[in-house]
Design a protein with these regions (language model features):
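Alpha-helical scaffold segments that mediate packing/assembly in large oligomeric complexes
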Residues: 79-148, 259-270
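Glycine/small-residue-rich hydrophobic helix-like segments
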Residues: 185-235
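Extended, solvent-exposed, turn-rich assembly/linker loops in the middle of proteins
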Residues: 117-187
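Long, hydrophobic/aromatic-enriched structural stretches that serve as scaffold segments
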Residues: 54-94
Length: 270
């Protein structure tokens, strides 16, 4: 029995599902709760009352975000076409191809676009130079200054930018110390302790060649993830594949500076 040619799939490799403490309120609104901390005071050894300086009740900072992405698809597989095509177009396989080729990349692109916009909003977009390695170090510097933990940082790069960074390192006198870290670490490597994820250029907004963020800074919400295969429709003799996805991605309040980007200005101007 012939098989349907498989489309290129890659979405699962880049899926970004970061979470935080949040609650869905209205159908299109999500509230994120963050506990606030207090500054230490001097302990009063001579005090006759509360030597700790009084009680400060724990307060929650509440940030509200609106979910705007509401996407859907519908695919019909006519029974006649299915039989005459020697049953190559199996509904389950088509659904999997749709998810891997269209839906997962769509959501990943939205996440990356959110990070890119966030970096621009806080003026942490590095202009690309001829020294790709130094450009990448600047991203780490931004996250260092905002006290983002090293554990949890992720660097996404285009294939071309990855090659530039790798070339800069492997031709450096420190190459032997880095070569082993650029392979076999999961992802495609590790750079200064940060996992590196190589992503197709088409996933990035125009001009963006690299993005770095801490996982705690990016909130990815999937309110509705629905897929169905209908085999008893009165309108189609065959199968109907349906899908609906309501999702959103946000840079969390208080963590806005835990994102940075490298921008190729020539690509934007052209």
């Amino acid at each position: 029995m012939p098989e349907m040619a498989k489309p290129a799939e890659g979405g699962k490799r880049y899926s970004l599902n970061y979470a935080a403490m949040y609650r869905l309120t209205n159908w299109d609104t999500v509230k994120v709760y963050t506990a606030t901390t207090v500054a230490p005071t001097d302990y009063n050894r001579e005090g006759t009352g509360d030597r700790f300086g009084g009680n400060a009740e724990l307060q929650d900072t509440i940030a509200t975000y609106q979910i705007t992405n509401d996407k859907a698809f519908k695919i019909a597989i006519d029974r006649g076409n299915f039989e005459q095509g020697m049953r190559a177009k199996k509904a389950g396989e088509v659904m999997r191809y749709e998810m891997n080729e269209q839906i997962i990349p769509m959501i990943d692109k939205d996440r990356l676009a959110t990070v890119a916009a966030g970096a621009t909003a806080v003026s942490q977009a590095v202009s690309m130079t001829t020294d790709a390695y130094q450009d990448t170090l600047k991203l780490n510097e931004y996250l260092d200054e905002c006290k983002a933990p090293l554990d949890g940082r992720v660097l996404w790069v285009t294939p071309a930018e990855y090659n530039k960074v790798k070339t800069a390192i492997t031709t450096n006198i420190l190459a032997s110390g880095y070569n082993d870290k650029l392979v076999g670490k999961g992802f495609v490597g590790e750079l200064d302790g940060v996992p590196v994820v190589k992503v197709p250029t088409s996933y990035f907004p125009t001009g963006i060649v690299a993005l770095m963020t801490h996982r705690d800074a990016l909130l990815g919400v999937r309110q509705v993830t629905e897929t169905r295969i209908i085999t008893d429709s009165e309108f189609v003799s065959g199968s109907i594949l349906l899908g609906r996805f309501i999702f959103g991605s946000f840079i969390l309040k208080g963590k806005e500076k835990a994102v940075a980007s490298i921008v190729d200005g020539s690509a934007i101007s052209s």
